[in-house]
Amino acid sequence: MKTKLNELLEFPCVFTYKVMGEAKPELVDLVVEVVQRHAPGDYTPQIKPSSKGNYHSVSITITATHIEQVETLYEELGNIDIVRMVL
């Protein structure tokens, strides 16, 4: 039986996105820009480089107010050209 994400979450809730993308200086700014459009706030993303330094992971935590916000952010973060994966 498949459980849907909205059945597991109770809103509002704290939700962290982990965005993996190319190790380019603009990655963090692009991630924060997308998040600000849907969940305005003061963010301090955590950045970790990959072992070879080709990629960075950017973790950013929001207070989600509804499931549509969570799903829209997954989609829009994934649409950033230099992003490879969103968890």
UniProtKB/Swiss-Prot annotation:
Q: List the disulfide bonds.
A: none
Report TM segments.
none
Q: Which InterPro entries match?
A: UPF0250_YbeD-like, YbeD-like_sf
Naming one, the record's GO cellular component terms include: cytosol
What family is this protein classified in?
Answer: Belongs to the UPF0250 family.
What is the protein name given in its UniProt record? Answer: UPF0250 protein PC1_1177
The source organism is: Pectobacterium carotovorum subsp. carotovorum (strain PC1)
